[in-house]
Amino acid sequence: MFNSCEVAPVDDTVSHMKRVRDAWVKVNYGSNYVALTKSGIYVLEESDGSGSSVLDSSYCFVNYSMIDLDGTYKSTTDPEIAKMHLGTYSDTVYWAPSIWRIADYTQNDGARELLKMMKVGGKVKAIVPPELSGVTYPKDYKTSVVTSNKEFSVNMIYEISLEKTVKNIEQYEFDLLKNYAEKYWNGIDSTVKGFYFLKLKENPVESDTIVNGTSINVYYSGHVIDGITDNFLFDTNIADTARMYRRYNKDKSYTGLSVTYYKDPEDAISNNSLVDGFARAISEFKYGEEGVAFFSSSHGYKAEGSGKTIPAYSPLVFYIKTQDK
């Protein structure tokens, strides 16, 4: 536990937060910290990485924890810390590095400054002033927002581990998909850019073709492709699958998902409230068939991801079954 100098502030000015920072460092580190930057960041500890440096265009895969000066954890990517300190651990959360960017100003000023000091494999522990926990955009940046709301109103300790960087996130996803196809599906080719489909069970009865505009029930399980396990289940409407992955929820109704069938993929996409890749896959089926579709985030949840189960820029795989006629 840290020796805290963080008290209820008389005011929230920059100068007050600086005094709190200075006092905390003096008590806990003395002069044995690494550096004090011009912007007011105290770099407390660092471990140099041996990999590539962070470029303005880099997509940075980062494990992190945010801790206030009292030693209270506020957020983390570490499941053990979430379990021990935050009480937020859940098997339904996808625990993996976050993707932080510099070029598109989705990352706050303090984190961006720290990342630019780092190389892959490196770690840093630093106190970031609250005024650097927002995003300051350059004057020529095309946004209606000049400075975002600050993430924190007090000084915050950032513990950051830079796991890897990627220059081209689209190509990174394509490589994951290609490797996935080769590892599990005999190297099948994509049918459109970033989208793969394979029929696993075919219905030979021609009369079981689904008519355009028909509402049908489909059953599915959705998983994240990460190049490691490729098996994290983020959603299913099949009770046995939920049980197998220890995701069963007694309060959930495991029934078919009603979708409107269209043979043309673009019609299927535009007439259903589904991610593009899932809707595109439905257009490939007849009644009583099963298949697998996997695709890049451009056909899925894109740069935003979805909640705590689907990270940003995540390729996904769906196992899908259509109802019998």
What residue spans do the PLM features occupy?
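Cross-family detector of peptidyl-prolyl cis-trans isomerase
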Residues: 5-325
